[in-house]
Amino acid sequence: MPLIVPEAKKSPTSLVEELENRTFTKEMLRYNKILDAEHNSIYNEMIGVLNEKNEDENSSIINILSLDGGGIRGLVITQIMLEVERVMGESLFEYFDWVAGTSTGSLVAAGLASGQTLRELQRVYIRFKDLVFDNRRPHNTAVLETFIQEELGKDKLLFDLEWPRLLFTTTKADYFPVQLELMRNYTLPTTDDENFELGFKNSEKLYLWKALRRSSAAPTFFSAVDNKYIDGGIISNNPSLELLQEVQFWNSFNKLKNIPKSVRIGCLLSIGTGSIPSTKLEPAHLELAQNYITQPITSYNAVITIGQILIDQVKVQMDAKGDEEIAKMMWDCIEYMYIHQDYVEKVCTLLRKVGKSPKRREFFASCSNYTTNPSTPVK
């Protein structure tokens, strides 16, 4: 499908007006009749459930958000969310109770949970590309770490972000095959020992900046963290499946412990960052690649299973920094969202029906977590 390429003499306002007045054909849409039929069936069922219940009864129905990895293509995530906000007419992030992020998706989630707006995050990314991405790889890790610390706090812990529930992915690469590890801002309502046994490993002592470094340490782009943690996108670039499993695990744990609390997913919004251009792998990195190829989960399979807002035509390198290239990428997002306006409106309708997350925060708080003893943060 041909893209609208902004002409030099056209103003941004005229370009948007032109886009609003276009007629979009079915051939221009991202369409799969089997997946769309399934999505429509689930959507109609959930709308029916929400219409039958009153506001109090809806308190256990939640919205969850999944944000893909992709380096500078975090700007794709922010632009997509801005376009959804344009339809919503209000802030989007406060509708979500549980958010999963990989790599740049973790950075976006952490920024929003810290109180930054989407526009502020876009300015952060523009500064990021100019300061962190130099002309050689791997890029300077010290500059990256300093940048994250200055933006989100050097002494802030992951647990200091109390709401929404956050789930960040990283890859533990000091084992073969490499293993997915999850970092959270919450624990299960049980003892420290049982939390550790079930994989909830000391996130309450983890600095936020270090959690983000672990999630975004893409091989050949940035060095590993503590000589073992690398980018979560190696195994789970789209963390939707991990997020779904996490919600189900929370329900199962509460059932096992006779805790009368469970949730039902009202809406899963999964936002991708486009496809990655193919690049030739240097011989020095072949052995590294062989370690990763054994992992069975790929982002593409997750997309097929779940369905997500995905900008297929965005093929920008993770460390791209050219202003023209970045501007075109963001314009492609705007065009894509206008083309799929009907889909966006359905998402907004479902989110509104479920409602904003603050009213459900008390529901989660009523199943209070076990409080650990004070400890020294992980530096």
Per-segment meaning from a language model:
Residues P2-K379:
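Conserved catalytic cores and adjacent C-terminal regulatory segments
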